[in-house]
Amino acid sequence: MAMGTCAVTASAADGDKYTIGICQLVQHEALDAATQGFKDEVTKELGEDAVTFDEQNAQGDSNTCSTIINSFVSNNVDLILANATTALQACAAATTDIPILGTSVTDYATALEISDWSGTTGRNISGTSDLAPLDQQEDMLVELYPDAKHVAILYCSAEANSKYQATEFEKYLDEDGISYKEFTASDSNDIGSVVQSATEYADVIYIPTDNTMAQNTEAINNIALPAGTPIIAGEEGICKGCGVATLSISYYDIGKKAGEMAYDILVNGADITTMKIETAPNVTKEYN
């Protein structure tokens, strides 16, 4: 079943069949969990026979994201799931008609360059955010390392959502009088030298939710662990790979929530232009 508007008035019980395109930026634990949560929920709500998923992975390349999304648009899929910010931005540029749900996107206003933010995009885009409580993550850092004087904030400069988290996290460090410095890698090739510099500066490293860092936790751990520099992570996948602790959302849960939103759009005819961005219902402390 194809569609050219933002809302559908149909019922899966009437035998309608839907095609959903899924563009995942890259393969790593967090994004994989979000995609799985989405598929599980949509399949549960619609039934296996009522939905076909065209699932594509862009292998971390923005141009590949655009190619994938353009193929979805050409095939006139009923809805697109954009898993990660780069995928969402490619969708936003490709279509104003097909409903787009984002997931694993931290800040939609930043990603879509919306200056007057009210919780909805006002266009054919909604979804779920992976923004964790940054104030509580900073509290965790202080609780675990009360003598820390210098914090390195490590992220990829190409990821706008990571910069947003870093800026917000720094506000809480300022409140506690803790010095900090940003250490940014432009891509995976820079990570080794950047992490080495971070360990030389910091008592503790903080890594926000960041796809490039999530892909390279082994390389990060191989430098930070021998240096004796602990890492507080923004999400559980990074924590498992190189961190000491995190206060993390469940990526499976935000994918599942996006699946609920998809059902509401496809079957109940919900107007995506007025659907608020949803957040994770719970956060969990995890230690490694």
Residue ranges and their predicted role:
Residues 2-15:
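Sec-dependent signal peptide cleavage junction
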Residues 14, 108-149, 249-270:
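Hydrophobic alpha-helical segments within soluble ligand-binding/sensing domains
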Residues 19-45, 54-64, 212:
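Extracytoplasmic "Venus flytrap"
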Residues 20-22, 38, 126-173, 271, ...:
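An alpha-beta-alpha
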Residues 44-65, 124, 152, 170-188:
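Short beta-strand elements in bilobed, periplasmic/extracellular small-molecule ligand-binding domains
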Residues 55-116, 210-225, 229-234:
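Beta-alpha junction/loop-to-helix N-cap segments that form part of ligand/metal-binding clefts
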Residues 160-229, 235:
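Pocket-lining segment of extracytoplasmic ligand-binding domains
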Residues 237-287:
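Flexible loop/turn connectors
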